[in-house]
């Protein structure tokens, strides 16, 4: 009975994180692209390297840095990043300065696996930032959960502030 009680308690604690912000709840834009809204920012959902290259090219033309968030629906740390970090008002304000992409690798398709492999990631959460030349700022990479204030500092450093 103690085991059942522990499992029930863990499920109760995790339930708000699991219920918030499922990527499937995102809206579909006129161009067919899926969006994932977090606070006042919207991530464009991608699933392949080809899509990433398309958005990196657009961001270069717009002279904006790109933030790529690797995500799966069942990842507790991904949900913590959404609820605690991305939704933080200061983080949300800084995120608006980036082209925001979210690699939803929930399906674990061949394209998803290739995207993870391209950057040497085993799985989410992982956040990569690309400069104006579409090169990853490897020293700014975030693996796992990061609290809001540290994340804001990382974003500001990436932007040169």
Residue ranges and their predicted role:
Residues 1-99, 103-161:
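Proteins that catalyze or organize thiol-disulfide redox chemistry
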């Amino acid at each position: 009975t103690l085991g059942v009680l522990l499992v029930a308690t863990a499920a109760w604690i995790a339930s708000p994180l699991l219920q918030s912000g499922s990527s499937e709840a995102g809206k579909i834009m006129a161009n067919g692209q899926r969006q994932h809204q977090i606070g006042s920012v919207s991530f464009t959902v991608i699933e392949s390297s080809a899509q990433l290259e398309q958005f990196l090219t657009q961001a270069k033309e717009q002279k904006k840095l790109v933030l790529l968030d690797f995500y799966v629906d069942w990842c507790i740390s991904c949900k913590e990043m959404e609820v605690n970090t991305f939704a933080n008002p200061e983080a949300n304000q800084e995120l608006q300065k980036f082209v925001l992409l979210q690699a939803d690798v929930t399906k674990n398709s061949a394209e998803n696996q290739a995207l993870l492999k391209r950057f040497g990631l085993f799985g989410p959460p992982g956040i990569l930032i690309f400069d104006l030349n579409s090169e990853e700022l490897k020293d700014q990479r975030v693996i796992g959960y990061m609290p809001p204030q540290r994340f804001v500092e990382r974003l500001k450093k990436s932007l040169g502030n």
